[in-house]
Amino acid sequence: MDDEVYKQRLTALNNLRIVIFFDILIILLGYIGTWNLKTLQLVNPSLWSFSPSLWIYIRGTVLCADCIFTAGSANEYSAVQNSVFQVSSLMFYGLMMEFFGYSFDRVGCMELAFISFSAACYFNIRSIKSLSLKNKNWTIISIIEIPIKLHFILNVLLFLKFSEYMLPLLGRVHLSYHLFALWVINLYIWIKLIDSKDFVLGFLAGLSVLLLNTGSLITAKPLISYFNLLTSCLIIFPSIWIYAIEKKNFKNLSYEDDDYRNYW
């Protein structure tokens, strides 16, 4: 492979590493001053110990940085192959829609926030489908696939939250609705997990729903909560099992290997 193209690829991957760093950073910032994971705090920042209003600005800044580095990755990757450019572009569009959703939430336009998070979910799904058509190596899984699927799960939860503003009757069953919706997500991911052996999406979804069903929800709606916890575990453990079986099929290649250089 041409050295210039190889250099562009490494630059793009390094940009996406920065995206992961920002994503992890913003999650950690939400836990400042909190020892126990609070229920639905990913969906509802007002439940965080960190200032909700300040969190909106921090999240917006991080998403803008994500967009910049993802767009840079798409630009670098366009010289390598159009299919990879498409993945990075879809990731960029999803991040932009997510940013618009938080912005509309900040100014009180709940309907526009709902539309924005719906669009973010759409672009996330397209990114995941595009990735599923490719062979996997650990670089692609860790740098591209995991951030996309983390954003997808978060956007689905935000989509559920803002759907209540579009369907006023759901406000009367706020708690039950969220719990039931999480179970539906679990069921869908479980089906996709068996169908595509997508251990990354299965594990992240199962773990997120497991964490979101802690605390007061268990005492408020014990039957639905425990059912969610059970289905979460039924997703997490098969995900690990599938990973153990499929691990040998992944190409654990280094940057210096010729096969890695010719991967895309």
Curated annotation (Swiss-Prot):
* Presence of the UniProt keyword Endoplasmic reticulum in the record: yes
State where it is primarily located: endoplasmic reticulum
Keyword set, alphabetical order: Endoplasmic reticulum, Meiosis, Membrane, Transmembrane, Transmembrane helix
Q: Where are the transmembrane segments?
A: 18-38, 54-74, 84-104, 140-160, 174-194, 199-219, 223-243
Q: Which domain of life is it from?
A: Eukaryota
Q: Which Gene Ontology cellular component annotation is one that this UniProt entry carries?
A: endoplasmic reticulum membrane
Q: Write down the membrane topology.
A: Multi-pass membrane protein
Q: Does the keyword Acyltransferase apply?
A: no
Q: Where in the cell is it found?
A: Endoplasmic reticulum membrane
Q: Which Gene Ontology BP terms does the record give?
A: meiotic cell cycle
The record describes the protein's role as:
Has a role in meiosis.
Name the record gives this protein: Meiotically up-regulated gene 162 protein
Q: Which organism is it from?
A: Schizosaccharomyces pombe (strain 972 / ATCC 24843)
Origin organism lineage: Eukaryota, Fungi, Dikarya, Ascomycota, Taphrinomycotina
